[in-house]
Structures are given as C-alpha cells and as structure tokens.
A protein has these predicted regions:
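Short, solvent-exposed loop/turn segments at secondary-structure boundaries
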Residues: 19, 149-152
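Short beta-strand-to-turn element immediately C-terminal to the catalytic PLP-Schiff-base lysine
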Residues: 23-24, 140-142, 181-182, 190
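Internal, well-ordered alpha-helical segments in soluble enzyme and binding-protein domains
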Residues: 82, 112, 145, 154-158, ...
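Conserved alpha/beta core of the MobA/IspD/sugar-nucleotide pyrophosphorylase nucleotidyltransferase superfamily
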Residues: 151-192
Length: 192
C-alpha cells in the first residue's frame, strides 16, 4: 500500500499570507492538488490519501472532499513537523510506501503522480519526480526509510535520503509540474 500525504502546513513566509487559500483559476491554491489526488485515489486500489495541515479551513476543505484530514499543530516549526504528524497518522507496514506531495504545486498532473505511485515496488527505496535534470516534489519513500524521515529536523525535507543510489527518477511531462508557488510573483507568473 502507498500512503499519499498531502502536505499543507507551511507558513507561507515569502508569500506574506496563507498562500494555500489564495485563489488560482477560481479555486484555493491547495485545492488543485487535493482535487487531482482525490480523483486519482478513486481509480486505484493501492493507495490512501490524507491531507496534513494546521489550518482549519484547509482541514475542513479536505473533509468536504472525503479526504482524511490530519491536524499538525507544530507545522509552523518546519516541514519535518508536518511530515512526522502525517507519518504518526499512518499504520505503516514493512512493505508500504509513503508519497509526499506539497500543496503549492498546482500543475502536478494525475499522469505524473500515477507514474510515481507505480514506482512503489520491491527493490525501490525512494523515488522523485524530475524534468530536464531538475528533481523535486512529489517524492516516494519505502517504509524502511521511515526512521530517516522521523529524524528530519526543522524545515528539512527528505532531500538527503533521496541521494541514495537506489532512488528512482520518475519523469514529469513538463517543467511546469515542478513549479511551486512561493511568492505572489510566482503565483502571477503561473497564472499567465
């Protein structure tokens, strides 16, 4: 089983306000990925989905979509706290995988996400989405790497774990899928 954790707990420091609620194409930013993932999970029997956040409106939005909502009160301290809150909510088994998807990548497609989920197989320790030599989120980790994920601190993500030689690169269809919205300017550019 692959457990998808949709990470929506960031502080939006560079954005100046909660970017997850900021409208993009008629929907709050976080809903783009959430809606795509919720629809994808409905077509597969090999994965679950949970949204992890400290924001009530975002948690309520997940519940309204029928998605499990995990409260992460310490997310303001950094991404590692959101990751741990999500992991704590799982009944992780030795053969399981965990996929981490960040909520500020509105152009990630179901096709690319399905390729990442398909990478969850014996012999694979981790996987990441890449385009043109640039790699980023989303990422996938085998349950065997959970101790390393729990050891993360502050705003550290799993980048160090992804340097392993048994880490698979999953192709995205375009560079736009890896675009994350961190500032109002990046949001305006994305909307163009």
């Amino acid at each position: 089983m692959t457990h998808i954790l949709y990470l929506a707990g960031g502080s939006s420091r560079r954005f100046g306000e909660n970017k997850l609620l900021y409208p993009l194409d008629g929907r709050p930013l976080y809903r783009h990925g959430l809606d795509m993932l919720a629809a994808l999970v409905q077509t597969r029997r090999d994965c679950t989905l949970a949204l992890v956040s400290r924001y009530g409106a975002v948690l309520d939005g997940a519940r309204a979509c029928g998605v499990r909502a995990v409260y992460s009160p310490e997310s303001e301290k950094g991404q590692s706290y959101t990751i741990r809150a999500g992991l704590d909510a799982l009944d992780l088994q030795p053969d399981d995988f965990v996929a981490f998807v960040v909520a500020d990548q509105p152009y990630l497609t179901a096709r690319t996400m399905a390729r990442l989920l398909d990478a969850a197989r014996p012999g694979v320790a981790c996987a990441r989405v890449c385009f043109g030599g640039r790699c980023g989120s989303p990422t996938l980790f085998s349950a065997a790497l959970a101790p390393g994920l729990y050891a993360l601190r502050g705003d550290e993500g799993g980048r160090a774990l992804l340097q392993r030689p048994d880490c698979v690169r999953v192709p995205a269809d375009s560079a736009r899928e890896l675009l994350d919205i961190d500032t109002p300017d990046s949001l305006r550019q994305a909307a163009e």
